[in-house]
């Protein structure tokens, strides 16, 4: 969770798309990013922790974590009072959308995807690639960079992708203190 905050923060501080964001807005978006996967609490553990590839049916269930997350946040009255509420709902719902419309849950394209969700999208993919999971070892930083830039993980906003390439070397520092990192 901390890495998503840090990666998002680094994007917000370095992307020309976010140059007019106030320090307060950058902090609110970074805090909201932490809740990107809150909807996974609605996904059965057998699917979340499955050591192998998900079946098409399981993947359809997994995809619901986006809408489930936004709905969960909207149902908590205290959340509505927080300054990052709208960002959190947008990020939870749209962080799996892709620039070319091949994401989910709505298949949005381009700037129809909220900017903060676009940023968390690439941050989440990078974190998932370079971190070990129950179903895979961590990829090397170099391999993760090549996969993202090469389009293996979907199509991202070209300006966000350019920022990612500029800051990727510094993103590695976020993981340098983790003793769990075992890169393949």
Question: Where do the PLM segments sit?
Answer:
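Metal-dependent catalytic cores of enzymes that make or break cyclic nucleotides
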Residues: 1-184
């Amino acid at each position: 969770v901390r890495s998503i905050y840090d990666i998002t923060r680094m994007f917000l501080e370095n992307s020309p798309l976010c140059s007019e964001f106030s320090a307060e807005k950058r902090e609110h978006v970074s805090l909201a990013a932490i809740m990107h996967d809150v909807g996974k609490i609605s996904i059965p553990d057998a699917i979340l922790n499955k050591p192998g590839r998900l079946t098409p049916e399981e993947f359809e269930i997994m995809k619901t974590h986006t809408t489930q997350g936004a709905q969960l946040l909207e149902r908590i009255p205290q959340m509505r009072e927080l300054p990052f509420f709208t960002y959190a709902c947008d990020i939870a719902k749209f962080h799996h959308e892709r620039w070319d419309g091949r994401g989910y849950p709505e298949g949005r394209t381009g700037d129809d995807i909220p900017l903060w969700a676009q940023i968390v999208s690439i941050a989440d993919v990078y974190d998932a690639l370079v971190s070990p999971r129950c179903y895979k070892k961590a990829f090397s930083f170099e391999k993760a960079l090549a996969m993202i830039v090469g389009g293996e993980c979907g199509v991202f906003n070209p300006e966000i992708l350019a920022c990612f390439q500029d800051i990727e070397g510094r993103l590695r520092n976020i993981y340098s203190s983790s003793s769990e990192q075992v890169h393949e």
